[in-house]
Amino acid sequence: MSSVFADPRVKELLNLHRSPKLATEGKTPPSQVQDLVNKYSRLGSNVVSHPTRSSPEKTTDKPADSKPSIPPLKSESVMTRLTALSSNNTTQNVASLVTAIASHPATAALPKQEASQQPVIPTSVEKRAVTQPLSQQNMNKLMNAIDPQAAPLIEDQVAGKHTGTKPLLTLQQQQAISSLPTKSERESALNEIALNTAIQSAQHANMELSKAGITFPMWFFGVQNQSDLVSRSFISLAHIQQPMVMNDSLLQEHLLVSDCIAVLQGCMQTTYLQVSEQNKEYVVTIRKEVATELPATLVAMTQRVLVHAHARFQIVNTIYTHQVPEYGRIANAFSQALRCIIKEYDFYLADLSKKHYGKMQSSAERGSLSLQTLEVKTKQIHIILENVADLCSRLGVVRGCALLQQLETAVLQSSGLSVKEVFQYLLSESLKPLGRIMDRYINEAVIPDSDAADFFIRKSHSTELAEEQGKTTINTWMQMFKVDDAQVPLFLNNIKTHLCDIGRSTVLLKWKKKQYIDKGPNASGQELLLLSAEASGETTQGFRHGEETVASLVCGDGSTGDLELAHIRLYKQLIDINARVQTKVLDFFINPEYLDFRGHLQNIYAFYLVMAGDFLSCFVESAISELVLSRSVANILRIRSKFKMVIKTSSLANLPYNERMNVIVCPELFKHHLNSVLYPQTYVPDRATDSPDPKVLNLLGLQYDVTYPLNLVLTTPVMERLNLVFRHILRAKVSEIELQKAWTTLQRLRKLERVPHDKIEVYANALRSDKSPIIIFFGVAYKMLITMLDFIHSLQFQYVTILTECIAKFQDTLVNAKSLDDLVSGMSAFANGLIMSLGLVSNNVVNILDTLFNDCIVYSHHIVKTFCIISNEDDEFIRKIVTINEESREGKSGPRGVKGSERMTSLLKKREAIEMTRLIAIANSVYSLIVDNRGLIATLMTKFNKGVASYEQVIRNFDDR
C-alpha cells in the first residue's frame, strides 16, 4: 500500500498546516482545514465530515456548507450508561457499550446514504499490498460455524455500490415484516434485526473473552467521555452491520494507526557505537531503527507509544502465517486506548515544558499525572493483548480472528475522529516532545541560553586530559544523558541517541582540529562549532537566521514564533547535521593526510595475516635458538631485536607504520587464548596437562600500537582476534619449517645407496636383489615425511584462499561505508569472519589441528636429531681426508718410477676407501635404527592419516552449516 500522505488532498492539508503563521496565532484555524475537506467532498470524494474538535484555546464556528450536526454524545441516557459502565468494578461488558451506542439518537439521525459510502480499508501486510476483507456473508458463515445460536446467518445482499445491506431473514421474520403497513416501519424492523444480531455477536465475543480471563480496566471505556479527542458524532448503524472499511482516498484514524504499526513491524536492525564501561572503548551493539517511509510524525508516535506491543505482533505474525485477510485491522481493537495514552503523555510533557518556559497552555485540568500511571495503563494493554494471543492459539486462528473482529467493531463505536482531527493531532502533537526533551536536557545542564555546540564542547573538556594520556573516556556522552527512568518516559531514548552521536562527532572533530589544523601554518583560533558551516564543511541551509540556535528552536524563540514548526525544524536539523558530520568523521579516518586507515590495514594484512611469507620464514629461522627456550629463560629483547632486523631486510621494509608492530609473549597457550576471547564469560581453562614453563614459540604473538582515535575502529576485541589468526598461522609455518629440515637430513643419507648389500651386517635374506637397501629401509620414513608436507602445504594454500576472500569482502565494505559506525561494524565483522572462516570457532577443528601440528614437529625432531648425529663425521675421518687433500694440492712425489697421473689415482682410491669405510659404519647404524623403529613409524603414519581424514570431515560438516 502506498503511503497515505501521497494523496493530493492530504498534501494540501499538510501544506496548509506547515504554512507560515503570524506570531499571535496558536494553531491553524480549523475552519480552513474543514473548507478543504468540504471542497473535496463536493468534488465527489467519499469524505465523511465530522464536526471539529472543541478547543479550549479558540472556538470556531462550523462552515455553512457542512452537514447538520448530530446529537452530541452527552445525552442523558447514554451518559448514564457510560458512567455506570466506567464506575463498575466488575469485568467491562462490550455488549453494553454497543447497546448504549446503538440506542443513541445519532444512529437514526444519520442519512441512509452514509451506509453506502463506507470506505474500504486496505489490509496491511509486510509489502503493504491491498487486499479486500472477507465479505460479511463469509464472516457470518464463520460465526455460524462457531456458534449457530449466537451468530445466525445474515446474507450480504448488495445490489450496487450505493445500496444498503439487507439481512437474510427467516420465514417467521419475513412474515412479521411483510405484515407492517409502511415502508419506513419495514426498514426500521430490518435495522432492528441487524442490530440485535450484532449485539448477540458482541455478547458472544465478550463471553469468550471473559472465559479466557480477558478483562478491560475501567479507564478503557470511562476515559472516552472525558477526552477532547472524542468527536460529537457517532458511527452509523452500518458500521455494526458491516465491518469497518475505508476508501483509498480518505485519511482516517484506523488507517494511520495501522500504518504506524506497519512501520514499527518493518523495523530494520542496524549497529551503532556504545561505550564499554570496562575498557572505555566503543563496542558495536544492536538497536532497532524505524524505517523512514512515513513522515517523522508517525515514526515518533510509534516509538513513543507501542513500546509494549510485543503481544500484538505475536497475533499479527500468527495470522499472517495462516494468511488470514484480517491482518491489518486488529490494531483498531485497542486504537482508542492508545490515543488516550498518547494524549496523557502529551499532557505530562506539556506540564514539564510549562514549568520551564510557560510556552504551552493546558486545555483542561486533568488531575495529577505521573509516568507510573501511564506505564501501568500501557502495561494493562500489553496484558490484554497477551491474553488475546493465548485465546487465538487455543481456539484456532480463524475463530480468534472472528472474535477479535467483533471486539474491534464494538470498541470503534466509542471513537469517531475526523480527517482533520487526526491529521492535525499527529502532525502537531507528536513532534512536540522531541523539542521538549532537548529543552529539559539543556535546562538541567544550567546553560539554557547557549548553543548546543558550546554545550557539547564544554562537556568534553573533562575528557581532553585523559585522551592526551592515551586513555579513551568518551563515555562522558553516555553519562551525560542518563536521567532517572522514573521521571522520563522510555521513548525519550530516540533523541538521546542522536545527541550522543553528535557529541561523539564533536569530540573527534575537535581532536582533529587540535592535532592537525591548529599545528598547520594556516591555523586559526576560531572555536569549532558543530552546528555551523565550519564543522560540517558545508553551508547549513536549515539555519536561515543566526539566532536560530538549538536552544532557541527548543524554546520556540525563532523568527516565526511557532513552537511546533520550530521543533520540526530542530528534529530535521539534528538528522541532517548528524549525517554531514558523520561523513566528515569518516573522511578523517580514511584520508591519508590524517589517520590513513588504509595504510594501517596494509600492516594488518602483511603481519597478522602473513600475506608476505618471506618475513615469517626468515624470522623463525633467525630466532629459532631463542624461540625454543622456555619462557622463564628466554630473552624477549633479543627476540624483538631480531624481529626488527628481519623487517628491515624483508619485503615489508617499505610499509607505512611498520615501526608500530612488535612481538610479544602471550600469557596463555593458543587454545586457552582462543576460548577466553570467544567465550569470555563461560570459559574455564583446564591447565592440568599444560607445561608449567612452555616454550616461547608456543606463546609468541604480535602487538600493534593503536592510539586514539584509531582505537575506536581497531578495538581491543578486533586486535585480539587478529592476534589469534597470526598465532594459528605461525603454528602451521613452524611445522612446515621443521619438516623441511627433516627432509634435508634424509636427503643427505641418500649417499648410503652406494654401500653394497654384503657390507651391511643387518642385511636380511628377505631383501630382493632388484631393490637397493636405501629404498626398502627408507621407504616408510620418506613416505611419512612427504604425507606431512603435503598436508601442511594444502592447509596453507587453503588459508591463503580464505584470507584473500575475506580481505576482498572487507575492501568492498570499506568502499561502501557511509559513517564511522559502518567502519567499526565492518572491521568487527572482518575479524569475526576470519575466525569463522578458518574454523577456529569449532573446538573439534582446533583440537585436531593441534594434534596434527604436534605430530609433524615431533617426527621432524626425531629425524633430525637421530640421523644428524649418526651422519656427523668423526675426527679420525676428517684427519685422514685432510691429509689426502693436502698431498693432492702440494703435489708431493710418490714412489720412484710412478707417474703423476698414477699418483693422483692412488690418492683418490685411498680417499674412496676411507669414505666407504665411514659409509659402511653409518649404514649399519642407520639401518639398525630403522629396522627397530619401522613399526613405530608405520603406527604414526596410520594415526596421522586418521587425523587428516577427521579434519576433512569436520571441515565439510562445518562448511555445510
Curated annotation (Swiss-Prot):
GO molecular function annotations of the record: gamma-tubulin binding
Skewed-composition ranges (Polar residues): 43-54
Subunit structure: Component of the gamma-tubulin small complex (gamma-TuSC) composed of tubulin gamma chain, gamma-tubulin complex protein 2 (GCP2) and gamma-tubulin complex protein 3 (GCP3). Interacts with tubulin gamma chain.
Residue numbers spanned by region Disordered: 15-76
One Pfam short name: GCP_C_terminal
Name of this protein: Gamma-tubulin small complex component GCP2
Keywords: Cell projection, Cilium, Cytoplasm, Cytoskeleton, Flagellum, Microtubule
Similarity section: Belongs to the TUBGCP family.
Organism: Giardia intestinalis (strain ATCC 50803 / WB clone C6)
Localization per record: Cytoplasm, Cytoskeleton, Flagellum axoneme; Cytoplasm, Cytoskeleton, Flagellum basal body; Cytoplasm, Cytoskeleton
